[in-house]
């Protein structure tokens, strides 16, 4: 691809980003990313987060979901966040930087969570996209499998799970896997999710344990 094409594409993305009403509203309300409106819409419909809950936020940076979760769980609750990228501190959030695919990072994350179980696992993780669907989709599915495995390790009975998933190869099998583990499973496409994106959010409640 030529440099001019890349520049034109980048320019369109930047214009779309800065004209985006969700970007503008996030800035106005003091949130770190437009992604906050995705979890807010899920919360308004499904009421996953309640005062006093313990929440794990995977793929947390830059911190929009963690910011929102802290507001919902309050001073009696706890938010434990993890990301391979750095994240500026948020009051009430215990943040661990690292790749939890690595055993040492996973152990450190589990140490922060245990001995208590958690009420909600949420994941907005996505791989760095190459533009090659044959490469990107397996990477994305690998991450959502890791998030589901985290549920198996730390989620309390009747706990909840929400995860960003890209529709494509492996999606139907993954959805069935989630349905086997939870009593109620819904698929959400938040208004703030760009229409052209293949992303949807699986919202699962009533973990069978």
UniProtKB/Swiss-Prot annotation:
The protein's Enzyme Commission number: 2.1.1.166
One matching Pfam family: FtsJ
A single GO molecular function term of this UniProt record: rRNA (uridine-2'-O-)-methyltransferase activity
This protein's UniProt keywords: Cytoplasm, Methyltransferase, rRNA processing, S-adenosyl-L-methionine, Transferase
Keyword Iron in record: no
Domain of life: Bacteria
Subcellular location: Cytoplasm
Main localization, broad class: cytoplasm
Catalytic site positions: 164
Cross-referenced Gene3D superfamilies: Vaccinia Virus protein VP39
Function: Specifically methylates the uridine in position 2552 of 23S rRNA at the 2'-O position of the ribose in the fully assembled 50S ribosomal subunit.
Name of the featured protein: Ribosomal RNA large subunit methyltransferase E
